[in-house]
Amino acid sequence: KTIYLADSKNAPYGQKNKEEIVALSKKNVDFLLKQNCKLIVVACNTATTNAILELRAEYEIPFIGIEPAIKPAANNSKTQVIGILATKGTLNSELFNKTAEMFHETKIIEQVGYGLVQLIEDGNLNSPEMNQLLESYLRPMIDANIDYLVLGCSHYPYLIPQIKKILPKHIQIIDSGEAVARQTQKVLNEKRLSTGVGDEGG
C-alpha cells in the first residue's frame, strides 16, 4: 500500500532555511517508519535538495528524491538557454547549484515562484493574481530565448495548463514526476520491496 503524508501544517517549505527543512524532513520520516514504510519518496524538490543527503546518512531505508530536471533540458536544448521555475529553497540549495554547474555551457534562467504554492494550496489556479504572477515570471525567460522550462516544485505541474497559455508552443515543459515514478518502481523491484496482497507496509 501507499501512505501519503502531506505536511500542510508546515508548508510551504520553499522559504524555510536548510536546518528547518532537515528537521521537518526527519520528523516526517520518523512518522512514516512507524507505519512500516519500506521506501520513502521525498516528493518535494525543496526537501530533496536540502535534506535527502542527511536522510540517507541517518536512515537505512531507501529514499528517492525529486530534483529539477536540469539534465534532460540542458542536453536537449537547441538554444542552450533553459528556464527553471522553483522555490527559493531549491534554487539556493547546494545540491541544485552543484547540478547546475555541471551544465555550465547552458544558460539557466532561474526564477523563484514567489506566491505560487500558496495560491495552488488555496485553489486559486485560474485567478487573475496567478496569471499575473506567471506572466511576470515567464516573460523574461521567453525574451531570453529559452526552449525548455523546468518545473522545480512538485506543486507546479498543476499550473501547466496556465503556463502553456503564456509560453510559445515550441517551448517544452519538463517536470520530474514520471522519472520519479519509474525510479520508484525500479528500486521496489530491485530490492523486492513490493508487497503482496495482505502484506503490511508502504
Named regions from a protein language model:
Residues 1-202:
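Non-catalytic structural scaffold of enzyme domains
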